[in-house]
């Protein structure tokens, strides 16, 4: 039997009268995609799955990279992440009112005139300071959170924990195939006329077109990415910074989203 798949938004699902019917029974399961996915299966008519975090996270600012020396002399490359004023709960979203459970966090204090009136009103309703960035963390349990609650990094994470860090990569602009996709260049001598050109990008009459997704020159970087299972090497309460092993997305000053690492069998159920 063919499997029908469609991506829809959650509010539209709640407005559908078919949710209450016996043929449509939604079941919420963690998935890789942040969108809601409806698919048919032999046992259940439809299964609704959405992406959720393994736990509450925080936002921080990338400061740069350095070398950290452990007690045995081992040198570990780390990225230093600092925290501006913020990481305050601005809204609690529930399944009854919003269609899903989530905690909205604000980060980086700014002046009032830097925000729009709707943004200012939203933060004033929560009783928080004006903040530039607002992000949601979808959780399976939102108990224990309240508006204007401040989240402290060392109360959520500790040294040795594994985290997932998301951010925007450094933009490189329009680049060729060699830099963007690591293609091998052509000969520079012996009469070669193609030094850094792509070469063939497809066949002739059949199919007579270039396939979608073909690796070609284009805009490089400046995209959202996530690096998973990075180790927290050091938490410095005095300097209000944390050192995370490895490189993190973006350049110094970039906004980072730090969440507990998703590990199958630990905080994610096995299939």
Swiss-Prot record:
It is found in: Plastid, Chloroplast. Residues 1-49 form a transit peptide. Keywords: Chloroplast, Plastid, Ribonucleoprotein, Ribosomal protein, RNA-binding, rRNA-binding, Transit peptide. Residues 190-222 are annotated as: Disordered. PROSITE patterns: RIBOSOMAL_L3 (PS00474). GO terms for cellular component: chloroplast; chloroplast envelope; chloroplast stroma; cytosol; ribonucleoprotein complex; ribosome. Belongs to the universal ribosomal protein uL3 family. One of the primary rRNA binding proteins, it binds directly near the 3'-end of the 23S rRNA, where it nucleates assembly of the 50S subunit. Part of the 50S ribosomal subunit. This is Large ribosomal subunit protein uL3c.
């Amino acid at each position: 039997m063919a499997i029908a798949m469609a991506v829809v938004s959650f509010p539209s699902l709640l407005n559908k009268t078919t949710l209450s019917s016996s043929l449509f029974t939604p079941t919420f399961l963690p998935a890789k995609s942040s969108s809601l996915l409806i698919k048919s299966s032999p046992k259940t008519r439809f299964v609704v799955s959405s992406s959720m975090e393994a736990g509450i996270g925080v936002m921080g600012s990338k400061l740069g990279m350095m070398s950290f020396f452990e007690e045995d002399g081992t040198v570990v490359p780390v990225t230093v992440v600092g925290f501006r004023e913020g990481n305050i709960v601005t809204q609690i979203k529930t399944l009854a009112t919003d269609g899903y459970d989530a905690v909205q966090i604000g980060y980086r204090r700014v002046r009032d005139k830097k925000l729009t009136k709707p943004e200012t009103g939203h933060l004033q309703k929560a009783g928080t300071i004006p903040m530039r960035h607002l992000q949601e963390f979808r959780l399976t349990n939102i108990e224990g959170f309240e508006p204007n609650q401040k989240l402290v990094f060392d109360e959520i994470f500790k040294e040795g924990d594994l985290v997932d860090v998301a951010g925007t990569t450094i933009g490189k602009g329009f680049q060729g195939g060699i830099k963007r996709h690591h293609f091998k260049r052509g000969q520079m001598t012996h009469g070669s006329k193609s030094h850094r050109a792509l070469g063939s990008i497809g066949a002739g009459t059949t199919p007579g077109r270039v396939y979608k997704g073909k690796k070609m020159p284009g805009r490089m970087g400046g995209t959202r990415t996530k690096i998973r299972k990075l180790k927290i090497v050091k938490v410095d309460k005095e300097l209000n910074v944390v050192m995370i092993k490895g490189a993190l997305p973006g350049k110094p000053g970039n906004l980072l989203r730090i969440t507990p690492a998703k590990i199958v069998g630990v905080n994610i159920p096995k299939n």
